[in-house]
Regions:
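An amphipathic, aromatic/His-enriched active-site/gating alpha helix that lines ligand/cofactor pockets
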Residues: 16-40, 46-51, 59-97, 145, ...
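Surface-exposed interaction/gating patches
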Residues: 2-14, 101-190, 229-236
Length: 236
């Protein structure tokens, strides 16, 4: 399965129209077939970064389905929708991503993805994108061994989940930077993020043998986005 990750710079005066285009247009239009589904629609929380930025992730069954979807956007039944949606945003950048070998999400059963716009509580995600100076495979392995596995063991030992790592993706060939990968993490308790924002990192957490120290052998540059799902986002 392919995952199309898009970052939309929305016209602030037309944010409602843009959201409606995805809720009332893109989502139900994809639901008419079996090639793709809108999975997540999330707003970059105001006060935490760039204004009026929306992140969407669309699941696409395979490469052939992606080509059919691209042709529909270029000259088929989705062309008018795409042209109208462009009037609600300044710019959109996209990359096709693949789940890494240890990602919990490898594919999605489209039959389980809601497409009716039903509303639910909001949820908070932290999207971490990193750019290693080592081979991308080494970086992905490090994320598993030094980050994901310890978090899982901590959750199993305490019975609490502070960070729910739902997926890890890397860019597919020809669609973005070679050495780039992304963590898609749900934050069950926003207090987790609040603590990060309001406290210095404990020196004990920066010593050799800790994730924050040892991971510097792989990269020292990454970007974190705090994203809040819409009340109708299919997954949340």
């Amino acid at each position: 399965m392919l995952f199309v990750h898009e970052v939309h710079k929305v016209d602030g005066r037309k944010e409602d129209e843009f959201e409606a285009a995805y809720r009332d247009g893109w989502m139900p239009l994809l639901a008419k077939g079996d090639d793709a589904r809108l999975l997540w629609y999330a707003n970059h929380a105001h006060g935490s970064g760039v204004s009026y930025q929306v992140v969407t992730i669309t699941g696409v069954r395979d490469g052939a389905a992606w080509e059919r979807l691209a042709r529909r956007m270029q000259q088929g039944d989705l062309h008018d929708w795409a042209c109208e949606t462009d009037t609600y945003r300044h710019e959109v950048t996209a990359r096709i991503m693949l789940p890494v070998y240890w990602s919990r999400i490898q594919d999605v059963d489209f039959d389980t993805v809601p497409t009716d716009g039903s509303e639910h509580e909001l949820s908070l995600f932290m999207e971490d994108t990193g750019w290693p100076y080592v081979p991308i495979d080494d970086y992905i392995k490090m994320w598993d061994e030094l980050y994901s596995q310890p978090i899982t063991r901590h959750a199993e030992g305490t019975g609490t989940v502070s960070i729910d790592i739902q997926a890890c993706f890397q860019n597919a060939f020809g669609t973005g930077l070679r050495r780039e990968a992304m963590l898609w993490q749900r934050i069950p308790n926003p207090e987790t993020v609040l603590h990060l924002l309001t406290h210095d990192l404990d020196p004990e957490m920066r010593k050799p043998g800790t994730y924050m120290y040892d991971s510097l052998e792989y990269r020292d540059q990454w970007e974190s986005k705090l994203l809040r799902t819409s009340k109708w986002s299919p997954l949340y």
